[in-house]
Amino acid sequence: MRILTLILTTIFLSSISAEHSHAKGTGLIFVSNERDHSITVLDPNTYEPIASIDSGRRPRDMQWNEDKTKLYVAASDDDRIEIIDVATSKIVGYVHPDEDPEMFDITPDGKILIASNEDDNMVSFVDIEKDKIIAQIPTGVEPEGVTISPDGKHVYITAEVSEMVHIIDIENQKTLADVLVGSRPRRAFFTLDGQEYWVTNEVSGYVSVIDTKTYKEKQRISFKPPGLREGDITPVGININPNGKTAYVTLGHANRLALVDVATKKVRKYLVVGVRAWNVEFSSDGKNLFVVNSGSDDVTVINAEKEEVIKTFPVGRYPHTLRIDD
């Protein structure tokens, strides 16, 4: 049976390679599965799996290179970032940012990968071409989120246990500020104008809005879905619509997605999604968003214009991150 599975997977991968070897924007959906040690590849029209890529142990965060020909995957328990060629769906290289890389980002020029090393309480800067660590900066306890500012000058790092965000100058590799936020800060985004940085605080149950000029927390956004206890509201994933008007926050154990007006900072709506809503990603046209549900091993698809759930499809065990080649 295992031989048959390998043969079928090879056929799928070969067909993908032949069809898309010179194409941009295949539409393929990639989902990292922490407990299956794999990346599920799905058809963008049917949401059916068409291939499974064996990865290193515990694949988590994923990021694209600039033209989306390569997908970088953090294999945390193997202490490496794997590079997947989209045309062939095969691993073609590695980057080694020291132990236990969980989240990472890549500078706009595609040269430097910046990763959080959760067990070592530091962040590593890696020259991608040379696969060489060029700087390591101490952080608070359990660094996680890594988000580069829109102008490419600064990187913001969340430190879960220390309850702070570190703001680091990328060119000089120097820490500019340490901003106290809520309990267990996790993921974040910048508004399109770069003036605000929004970060989820999982245990505190709110989002901190940080002014990127003053490095001060300027506002907090709380969530109160009807019928749920405060302790069940655990925001983790966060993203912003490509038009910059609406933010989407996954509320973890609340099994909800919150829709927040970016201008007013007011929650407009809650949608029921899967178990332990963990991450959220957009199609590039902003028409659909995808909520990764790590507790139910599936992904919820939402029509952004109608603000309603249109489908839920299964993936691997304990999905972490979803990326779309569009």
Predicted ranges, named:
Residues 11-326:
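Predominantly soluble domains enriched in secretory-pathway, periplasmic, or organellar proteins
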Residues 1-9:
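Sec-dependent signal peptide recognition
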